């Protein structure tokens, strides 16, 4: 389940209606993935890059650049948020958004569609106010709820500075508005969800809030 892409989808504003979330796994054949994207003839393709898919994405972006030369290719995700210019996949993309792209992806899409592309390839997303973010949980489909892991998060960031962990760079710690988060969780429960997987770096940092949840 691509949790991050659902955040982007939920926060696209007016562009949400003309955007499609298409998910694949590392077990899918690259040619099949390419064909699924190409047949949609998108104006913009956004791809989440992680340690486990960076090799496949590098090949995919190269193929997309060849087959869809007029399509904007935008990358994001942890694998391209900290080391950018050194990676081959970055060189082949039009843009890379580093950090929390909830609003930055929408803003970039708006500029690209308006014919006003930014000059720089790497776009550093600011730290968004979590109260301004549309929660992504309505983007979970009935099929997702029946067959996929349901990821949730009540906070972002980590107060610790462990040298071995990239989460040390995700500061400061911020909480989503608790009442809004709990209401979204109740909606998921009403839809049949009985198991939640929290992705918070430090869920129990605020014991009062974690106990309430």
Label every PLM stretch briefly.
Residues 1-5:
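Glycine- and acidic-residue-enriched helix-capping/strand-helix junction motifs
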Residues 131-213:
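Radical SAM [4Fe-4S] cluster-binding motif and immediate context
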Residues 8-11, 15-131:
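Glycine-rich beta-alpha loop elements in corrinoid/cobalamin-binding modules
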